[in-house]
Amino acid sequence: MQTTELVRFKKLGKQISVLTAWDAISSSIVEAAGADVVLVGDSLGMVVLGHSTTLPVTLDQMLHHTKAVCRGFCKPLSKQPLVVCDLPFLSYQCGEDKAVEAAGTLLKNSTASAVKLEGAEPETLLVIKRLIRMGIPVMGHLGLTPQSVHQLGYKSQARDKDSQEKIFKDSKMLQESGCFAIVLEHIPGEIASRLKKHIDIPVIGIGAGNDCDGQVRVTADILGLSIAQPPFAKPLLAGRELCINALKEWINSTDLDQVNPTTKTSESKSDC
């Protein structure tokens, strides 16, 4: 999957599916499910590493998880989902050179194809333009931006006229700077719907209504594995409960071999 395919999907009216992954197991599952894009998000700081925000996530951690995600795919490279990885906090806010080095490190040492960063401040736009000149595709992110949690909080954005006008202006600037798509997080659905028609690149929503060019979700939220479930991410599976019950059954079994006999294990089929 190439970034240009997503723009083509928008023109065709085809919905774009984006799911997160953080290791080889999760990426193999997401690939088998048919996701168009796999996002190695800095949300792994909360989902996997146990932090309360995304801010502590380091570039080394993002590289570690991105490499694991890329190793988990079964299909040939040309048929794999597009892999986008987040640039973590302070890897791009401190200047263009540092941003190029961070993005280059992620893409050079994995099979990821693009990076995502938050906001549309003048300094951020300069970073985006520099990255694109260096041949690194960039996905933007507006609305609720988790790396700005101490300034904006974890609450819905673009609720008043001024902030709505700003998000329209920012989306246009991200497009003009060269972004191939924009994530809109936790904004009113009617604003996202209008914004989708305002720009030519895909608008990927999360908590932004159903009328976007695509949707992105944290995979653990869909599977019901998260302890704290976001209000806009309805689980489609009681995954946490299922896992706990399965493990309890194994722990409480008087004959562990009978719970999962080796004969059945050897007959299991791989998705690859």
UniProtKB/Swiss-Prot annotation:
Residues that, per the record, bind 3-methyl-2-oxobutanoate: 42-43, 86, 116
Enzymatic reactions: 3-methyl-2-oxobutanoate + (6R)-5,10-methylene-5,6,7,8-tetrahydrofolate + H2O = 2-dehydropantoate + (6S)-5,6,7,8-tetrahydrofolate
Q: Kindly list the biological process annotations in GO that this record carries.
A: pantothenate biosynthetic process
- Where is Mg(2+) bound in this sequence? 42, 86, 118
The Gene Ontology terms for molecular function here are:
3-methyl-2-oxobutanoate hydroxymethyltransferase activity; magnesium ion binding
Q: Which CDD domains match?
A: KPHMT-like
* InterPro entries registered for this protein in UniProt: Pantoate_hydroxy_MeTrfase (IPR003700), Pyrv/PenolPyrv_kinase-like_dom (IPR015813), Pyrv_kinase-like_dom_sf (IPR040442)
Q: Which Gene3D superfamilies match?
A: Phosphoenolpyruvate-binding domains
- Chief place where the protein resides: cytoplasm
Co-factor note (free text): Binds 1 Mg(2+) ion per subunit.
Provide the assembly information.
Homodecamer; pentamer of dimers.
Give the function comment from the record.
Catalyzes the reversible reaction in which hydroxymethyl group from 5,10-methylenetetrahydrofolate is transferred onto alpha-ketoisovalerate to form ketopantoate.
Designated name of the protein: 3-methyl-2-oxobutanoate hydroxymethyltransferase
Organism of origin: Prochlorococcus marinus (strain NATL2A)
